[in-house]
Amino acid sequence: MGDFILFTHTKWSEAPRIRHQVANLLLEAGHRVFFFERPSPFWQSPAPAVEQARPGLTLVRTRNLFHHQLRALVPMHWLNAAFVESQIRRRLTVCDACADATIINFAHDYYFLRRLFAKSRIITIIHDDFEAQSRLPFASHIAWSLEHTCRMSSEVFAVSTPLQERLRVWCDPKLLLPWSVVPYRAPVPDMARRKLLVYWGFVDSAIDLNVVCRISDHLHEKRPDWRILLVGPTQGSGRQAVLDGVAGRANIEVRGRTELDELPLDEIIAALAPYRSSPACDSVTLANKSMQLFARGLPLLISNMPSYIQQPFIVRLDGTGGVGAAVDAVAANFLAWQSQIERFVADNAPATRLRLLGVEPAASAAGAVVGRL
């Protein structure tokens, strides 16, 4: 059993993302995880500072001086780094992490970690295009953080090919794509019931309503007994815009947060990813939720996302034939694609990502993790 210290800009209670998935992957492999959550503003006192969330998982909370998107000047980076570094040092004194713990860093601005862990293996995972997300009219302050963080790391991973290419100017990053947290499950082969297209994600302004409405129009004309289901929670205030955008369309239903297995999987013909073009979407190579959908045997219909991985069962809604050709493709090939989907899920099992990260399962968990292959 080994110890892993994870640094993130995420609360453990948030919707699961790659930070949570890596933590769970390590826990299931029999290791201990110390999960440093997103720092609170300096005027707040996070409580408890250290919390045993469950066996093997310790949540650790710190504070910072400035939000990572707002450090416009290098001295602001220095001041914040000194403050956060002191916070981390104090928290480590009350944690029982081993001195040789492996560090997995998801914070693009924690370039100071080498001062804290001089001899440790530090793995940095860049999971977003932070420069594109800059809240200021320039991104040089973010590039400064990224460069220094990459250069101090033992290894760097990127979650998409565009991010991987961006980071090459400072390091030799490897590609870390999402993996399937559950094994492939063959869908019921009753095609007569499959008349439902499902979007399962955040229902907000990231959805391209023009694409959704084109699908709705096509179904109304060509497949009047088919429906669209938009399922998920909302970040911010974008839900009302979605509701307004699909109002009056009888073949579209919007639901709140629902677990995937609570949906009528035997009625779903394909999953939807109808996203708007944006810097964040343009850099996506494989979305986290996609692997969960593939594990249930569902093909995927996507729009925009030019860097998305190419597979026969990932069909573009903005391709040559438009939404009609995409819908026809999943209707004609759903069963024929299952062997390819099953193989893709197996090739992206948890054990493959452990090996990529250079992590061995603890002896007590080795059989369970290897068995997932």
Name the predicted role of every residue range.
Residues 162, 177-181:
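Carbohydrate-associated surface elements
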Residues 12, 111, 126-138:
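A short, histidine- and acid-enriched strand-loop-helix "catalytic/donor-clamping" loop
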Residues 178, 332-371:
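A charged, aromatic-enriched C-terminal amphipathic alpha-helix characteristic of glycosyltransferases
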Residues 232, 239-262, 269:
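Nucleotide-activated donor-binding/catalytic signature segment of Leloir-type glycosyltransferases, i.e.
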Residues 13-17, 207, 262-266, 273-294, ...:
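Nucleotide-sugar-dependent
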Residues 189-207, 212-218, 229-231:
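Conserved donor-binding/catalytic core segment of Leloir-type glycosyltransferases
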Residues 22, 86-94, 129, 136-156:
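Membrane-proximal helix-turn-helix segments that form the acceptor-binding/catalytic region
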